[in-house]
Design a protein with these regions (language model features):
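Short acidic, glycine/serine/threonine-rich loops at helix termini
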Residues: 188-190, 237-238, 269, 398-399
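Conserved catalytic-core segments centered on acid/base and nucleophilic motifs
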Residues: 176-177, 189, 224-232, 255
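Canonical Radical SAM [4Fe-4S] cluster-binding loop centered on the CxxxCxxC motif
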Residues: 168-205, 257
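Short, charged beta->alpha transition segments
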Residues: 161-164, 175-177, 209-214
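Flexible, acidic/Gly-rich N-terminal and inter-domain linker regions that tether
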Residues: 1-168
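C-terminal accessory regions of radical SAM enzymes
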Residues: 370-434
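Conserved AdoMet/S-adenosylmethionine-binding subsite of the radical SAM
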Residues: 208-223, 232-377
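Conserved, mostly hydrophobic/aromatic
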Residues: 120, 186, 345
Length: 434
């Protein structure tokens, strides 16, 4: 049966399996609803209102569920990976599972395996299944229903892959998928077909070498985005091997890393990692975020280390129904990101992967969010709203309509407040009388 694989020669980050004989979620088949109800050890009580999370919350969680773990161990990213929550039994001891969550774990597992770092688990409300952060990482029964228009590879990345791990869609840049492993799996991941599994998407050093060779043989490639999976689940030495080999290619001008590690595994951003990354400028990092409640002091410290090293930081956010698809939540998110030196970069319409209909919003909601940001806050806070077109069409930007039309040669423009203004549009050059 397929399970997480980092490399053929190293099946997992060292010691990352859950202890006490517990298995991976996608290997653990639960057959009894009653069994799962007995695993739910969280007592019944009113759901508290959770706002800004703090270090004290993580500390309380650690002392309750990992009482023999020192603060030093908790802050070790290897420990966090080894102790991820990856099965129904462990999850049921930490949160009171809803009926939808329970049913999601009965019988065959969904396409996306379960893995949540203890750090990120400490942010999850144990009593409220509608909490935004909880919905992004805990499976529900909705994942098992496939809707019209959904596809395993909606963006046709596999069709645009000349060699394993390389997606070459745009003229001057490539996507380099270097691992299928993530520290925490998002339930709406566009690469649900590959994350956490092996088979055709098992990435290893041999495939890395083929990817490097392809990039070196194509001088039009000036920009390489390392993604996966999450490249920051790799060891420093593995990541440096990739960066060093890319830097040896004269026509590669910039390297980017796409990651959610600063948000779900901030312990990964160590001084040693940052010192290594500084050697490979210009290097950019795109941080995947979903909700303002993710922006804890730990995340702020991780981003500060990266920014202080001269690494420009941008964010990528997927628009998710009932999670961040309102102006107030998105405003808090983009303002919070700017305060920790992360530029809101892209807001993605959720990709139609199988079992994603409960996450996807009408495009009109995304336009409403952008309309509610533009003009009402600084331009630095406004991400570009895009649809990554199904069928491999690439990112297509979407904007609210601000051009009202023309009148007597003037362009009629509607501003953020809904007022219409006239702009004396220049005539075409060949119609100007000299």
């Amino acid at each position: 049966m397929e399970s997480e694989t980092l490399f053929a020669e190293e099946a997992e980050p060292p010691g990352s399996r859950t202890g006490n004989g517990l298995q991976l979620y996608n290997e653990h088949v639960v057959t009894s609803l009653d069994t799962l109800f007995t695993l739910t050890a969280v007592p019944d009580r009113p759901a508290p209102r959770l706002s800004a999370f703090s270090d004290s919350r993580a500390s309380a969680f650690r002392k309750r569920f990992f009482p023999n773990t020192t603060l030093k161990e908790w802050n070790d990213w290897h420990w966090q990976l080894r102790n991820r929550i990856r099965d129904a039994e462990t999850l049921g001891r930490m949160i009171r599972l809803s009926e939808d969550e329970l049913h999601a774990m009965i019988g065959a597992a969904g396409a996306i395996p379960l893995a949540i770092t203890p750090y990120y688990m400490s942010l999850i409300d144990p009593w409220n299944p509608r909490q935004a952060l909880r919905r992004t990482v805990v499976p529900t029964v909705h994942e098992h229903f496939r809707s019209s228009g959904e596809a395993d590879d909606p963006l046709h990345e596999d069709e645009d892959s000349p060699v394993p791990g390389i997606v070459h869609r745009y003229p001057d840049r490539v996507l380099f998928l270097v691992t299928g492993i993530c520290a925490t799996y998002c339930r709406y991941c566009t690469r649900s077909r590959m994350v956490g599994h092996q088979g055709n998407h098992c990435l290893n050093t041999e495939q890395w070498e083929k990817g490097i060779a392809y990039i070196a043989a194509h001088p039009e490639i000036r920009d390489v985005l390392l993604s996966g999976g999450d490249p920051l689940t790799l060891a420093d030495e593995q990541l440096e091997w990739l960066l060093a080999n890319l830097r040896r290619i004269p026509h590669v001008e910039m390297i980017r890393i796409g990651t959610k590690a600063p948000v779900v595994l901030p312990q990964r951003i160590t001084p040693a990692l940052v010192k290594m990354l500084k050697r490979y400028h210009p290097l950019w990092i795109s941080i995947h975020t979903a909700h303002p409640d993710e922006l804890t002091p730990d995340v702020a410290r991780a981003c500060a280390r990266l920014a202080d090293a001269g690494i420009p930081l941008g964010s990528q956010t997927v628009l998710l129904s009932g999670i961040n698809d309102d102006v107030e939540t998105m405003t808090r998110l983009v303002h919070g990101l700017l305060k920790i030196r992360v530029k809101p970069y892209y807001l993605y319409q959720c990709d139609p992967i199988p079992g994603s209909s409960h996450f996807r919003t009408p495009v009109s909601k995304g336009l409403e969010v952008i309309r509610g940001l533009r003009g009402f806050t600084t331009g630095y806070a406004v991400p570009t709203y895009v649809i990554d077109a199904p069928g491999g069409g690439g990112k297509i930007p979407l904007l609210p309509e601000y051009v009202e039309g023309r009148e007597e040669g003037d362009l009629l423009l509607r501003n953020y407040a809904g007022k219409v203004f006239r702009y004396p549009d220049c005539p075409a050059a060949d119609s100007v009388i000299h």
